[in-house]
Every structure is written in structure tokens, then in C-alpha cells.
């Protein structure tokens, strides 16, 4: 069974702010930038968000490209598991729509029980999710003074540096980054 989640309650950030320079840093870090939908247990509830993230080469999602999508699940008994297949593009989308139409026609006039709990799941604020952050700043910046011990990344881009923060919550990151001249930020998973 599950609970209803209103999609409007999920923080979403697209890929429009990702630049060529971000990809240069990702390559230097041996990571890929992927648009991820993430749900994590936080206390007694869950936190969910959609945003670009840097993932390492060792992560199974690293190889998901083109019209393919994947769902990566980590369970206490299952361990790590990934479901992978076509999910974007003209033909996969047409196939999914046609499949939905066939299912609707087969079950015309019937009520299909989905085992969802009637109460809405209240999501934890994204501020409570903890992770590392990759930030790009001007080369005269002092990211250690803002974020603490981390790792400087030099991708050979004139006038700027990259920096990987230590693990912190979204709220801690926002507070530390407030007023700083940050060129861009990408969350790090894995």
C-alpha cells in the first residue's frame, strides 16, 4: 500500500541552469550530471525532490542515456536494484499511451483498486535532506571559509574554481551560501 503525494509538494528544479562548464567539472570529477527524482526517508516521513545531481561512474545510473530511463531502489532486504528501459522519445511514449488506452478499454465501467491509503503523505521539507554540494565560484573566493573543509576542483576554467562541500543539509547549505557569489550549484549523490 502507499499514500497519496501531491506533485506540487515536491521541489522541482530543471536542467536549464546547467552549463558547458558544469559538464567540464563533472568530467574532471569522473561524474555525470543526471536529472534525478529522489525520495529518502527522513525521520517518520519522506523527503522528495527532482533536480540535477552529480553521480559517480560506479553508480548504475551513470550509464543511463538517450531515450532510456531507470529507477534505482535501495531496500533493506532487496539491497540495490535498478529497473531500466525506454522511457522517452516518440515511440516509447506512443507505446505507453497506447497501452493505457488498451487497459482503459479492457476495464471500461470497472473500478480498479490500487491499495492507496486515503490519507495524504505529508513530506518532510527538502531542507532536511543531507548531502554534499558542488559549487562554482570566482577564483578569488574562499569556499572553505563559507562551507568548511571540502575539496577544491580545478577544471582549467579561467577565473573560477569548483568546490565540493562536506555533507550538510539543504538548509545549512542555503544559510552558508546566502550572499556568496556562487556561479552555480549542483547536488551530489553517491
Which ranges hold each PLM region?
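Substrate-binding/catalytic subdomain of NAD(P)-dependent oxidoreductase enzymes
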Residues: 1-63, 68-70, 89
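Short, exposed beta-strand "edge-strand" segments with a Pro/Gly-rich flavor and a Y/T-containing core
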Residues: 2-5, 11-17, 97, 153, ...
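Context-gated lysine
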Residues: 17, 27-30, 34, 40-41, ...
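Short secondary-structure transition/capping segments
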Residues: 18-31, 80-88, 92, 150-158
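Generic structural motif
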Residues: 38-41, 53-58, 76-78, 138-142, ...
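Catalytic, metal-anchored helix/loop core of enzyme active sites in primary metabolism
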Residues: 46-136
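A conserved regulatory-domain signal marking ACT and ACT-like small-molecule sensing domains
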Residues: 101-190
